[in-house]
Amino acid sequence: MAHYELHVLFVHSWMLALILITTLVWLAASQKAFTPDLVFPEMNRNSSWSVANYGEILCPTSFQSYDPKKHQILTRVLVERPSLNTDTKVEGYTCHKVKYETICDMPWYFSPTISHSISPLRVKESECKDAIAEHQLGTHVPLSFPPEDCSWNSVNTKEYEDIIVKEHPVMLDPYTNNYVDAIFPGGISSPGMGGTIHDDMMWVSKDLAVSPECSGWQRSMGLIYSSRLYGEREPMLEVGSIHIEGHRDKNLTLACRISFCGEIGVRFHDGEWMKVSVNLDHPNSVTFQVTDFPPCPPGTTIQTAVVENINPEIQELTVNMMYRLKCQETISKMVSGLPTSALDLSYLIQVQEGPGIVYKREKGILYQSVGMYQYIDTVTLNKEENQLGENSRGQKVFWTEWSDSPTRPGLQEGINGIVKYEGQVRVPLGMSLRLEAATELMWGHPVHTVSHPILHVISNHTEQSVTTWNRGVNSTNLIGLATRSISGFYDNLKLYLILALIFVSLIALVVLDVIPFKYILFVLCPPLLLCRFIKCSRRKPETRDRYHVEYNRPGQVSSAF
């Protein structure tokens, strides 16, 4: 019997446990996940309100990791971020200035020597610009050696000067915003037009008006919130974070300063670089100096947003920008004295948790106060009278202070553009979209590492000259020609004298009847045949066109014509 009662008790306990588990599961499933679609301030009943100064109203900067107990010092700043294109090649031109010379040396005996030479000349900036303009228009006519100008017993020189333009891209060092290439002295040149290691050559970027630089600068408002003061003498360790409107917060720990795109900025611990400066519209903010940060170690690299992968972020930024423009338009209306609506007032409100300005209108006058904004889920909007929704702690959120609208009967206005009409609370249109866009922007974006360019410097300066001597068919080496001509003349003269003496001797012998006339031919034939053989055996040396090139290059040359 006892065993049976124990078995029944066990079965009942098991059934009760199943019922309890099923109930808990059903209750959990019936609970909706917290999905905030509104930010609303918690207001103290004793909060003080003051009349707003339209000239001091600013569009909101949101907060992400603000801790009111820890972060008691706020510094409003301007943040600029570059989106560097991965192609750091800079298109440009090189200008070579050369002189073509043709020299004709004709002595008194009418035997000219013609030579051609190419010499480098120092090029001027104005000459290079004109030559590039002709090159771009296609009107440049390339020159060569001028025709010779020969006259008796003189040396005449004719010369042409020409500037040869060639396309020559170089690299851009985004850290210093300088050009990098082996043709520059030391491998580096400032933007625009620069000299090279050759005196006769200059490099010019394609766009003479604007120097290439990092593109796609994005300007945003930011806020540094920290736990203590900081200055040049205090290390920047755990002083707080910087919030950038539309982006994730960044901790200032391990941040350092480094030059990028020709600007001094801050590299954060995640590798991303930004230029940060104080917004002068807030003179009461803590003085912020980039020099407060220690310099980054040599060789430190940074990361920038990948241009081709930020389309989703651009979409969210577009939404943010649209509402920011509406905010600026609202402020402009107020300053100009134009009427504004409750919807216009909602554009002045931040969309992130943390401390911020709260606005309300009473009898046409705008008042402001300070409240602590929190996320609200409006799924229970108007479930009870004046209910806006629930916060992340599950607490119901209400607003009960309403004032009659001065422009529309039956409409009541609360704070931050919230209105009540026909007993129903109406939330400003677009608030949910703004919050969604801001939340999406809190996530990271793809980045790429920017490396330092590596270059092996060839030379700081190189002298170069090229001279070409051309001996053609109608031009000779005068000294050699004169020597050969005189030598040949005397050789022939000796032969003719010998033959003349032999001939005269034979005639004398015939006249004196020493040798009969019939033997004259027998005596003369051997010498004549011998002379003919000697003369024919002499061949003139072949003459060919010869070219000789002399190079004078004291240093190593990295480029040639």
From Swiss-Prot:
It is a single-pass type I membrane protein. Keywords: Clathrin-mediated endocytosis of virus by host, Disulfide bond, Fusion of virus membrane with host endosomal membrane, Fusion of virus membrane with host membrane, Glycoprotein, Host membrane, Host-virus interaction, Lipoprotein, Membrane, Palmitate, Signal, Transmembrane, Transmembrane helix, Viral attachment to host cell, Viral envelope protein, Viral penetration into host cytoplasm, Virion, Virus endocytosis by host, Virus entry into host cell. Residues 1-30 form the signal peptide. The chain crosses the membrane at residues 496-530. Belongs to the vesiculovirus glycoprotein family. Pfam families: Rhabdo_glycop_CD (PF24833), Rhabdo_glycop_FD (PF00974). Gene3D superfamilies: 2.30.29.130. Attaches the virus to host receptors, inducing clathrin-dependent endocytosis of the virion. One of its GO terms (biological process) is fusion of virus membrane with host endosome membrane. Residues 531-561 are intravirion. Glycosylated by host. Homotrimer. SUPFAM superfamilies: Viral glycoprotein ectodomain-like. Residues 31-495 are virion surface. This is Glycoprotein. Disulfide bonds join 59-327, 95-128, 104-150, 214-261, 256-296. Its main location: virion. InterPro entries: Rhabdo_glycop_CD (IPR055447), Rhabdo_glycop_FD (IPR001903). It is found in: Virion membrane; Host membrane. One of its GO terms (cellular component) is viral envelope.
